[in-house]
Amino acid sequence: MAKSLLCSSTLNPFFSTTLSSSKKNQIAYSGNSKNQTSSSLLWKRRELSLGFMSSLVAIGLVSNDRRRHDANAAILEADDDEELLEKVKQDRKKRIERQAVLNSAVKEKGYLQDLVYKLSKVGQAIENNDLPAAGLVLGKGIDTEWVKTVNLAFTKLSTSPEENTEVEAFNSSLASLITSVNKNDIESSKLAFVSSAGAFEKWTTLTGLLEQLKGL
């Protein structure tokens, strides 16, 4: 009994101390756990806050870039509009000047109208295989008076490289036509006539005379 009591009285303080220490450790651990949880939540909140702020900054930068891009695009578009408007003005000015020249070129248009009639007669003669009749209209060479007057009209009314190119093509084809007709070469005459008439029609289209000359 005494031994039992001794053991009991000896062990109780040890168990009490152990239990007390264990409870303190549990409380301390619980406290540390709560502190760690609080710290973890705090860090998460900070991370979320920083992430949100970073997103706002990124959105702001993108918005600024877009605004700058839109502003630059607006400036370029305005420049394009001004260039287009200036081009329209220049084209209109050229058309007015060209029309004034055409309206005043009464004599030159008369020369060109005579050319239309001659080409029509030559075309009919070639179609009928009547090259002598075509030769009477054309003459013997390109140094005839009507060819000279036609080229005077070409020179006065041609204002662009494209128009001058068609004049050169016409004169070259006309020379071939006169030569072929005088040689009584029907096939070459047909080809040369088509080339001459085509070049002249293109020239009248470029100069704006297509609607002013009869028979085209």
Curated annotation (Swiss-Prot):
Interval spanned by the transit peptide: 1-38, 39-73
PANTHER family: THYLAKOID LUMENAL 16.5 KDA PROTEIN, CHLOROPLASTIC (PTHR35742:SF1)
GO cellular component: chloroplast; chloroplast envelope; chloroplast stroma; chloroplast thylakoid; chloroplast thylakoid lumen; chloroplast thylakoid membrane; cytosol; thylakoid
An individual GO BP term: photosystem II repair
Main localization, broad class: plastid
Signal peptide feature range: none
Subcellular location: Plastid, Chloroplast thylakoid lumen
Keyword hit for Nucleotidyltransferase: no
Keywords: Chloroplast, Plastid, Thylakoid, Transit peptide
A Pfam family reported for this protein in Swiss-Prot or TrEMBL: MPH2
InterPro entries linked to this entry: MPH2 (IPR038862), MPH2_C (IPR049072)
Keyword RNA-binding set for record: no
Protein's name in the database: Thylakoid lumenal 16.5 kDa protein, chloroplastic
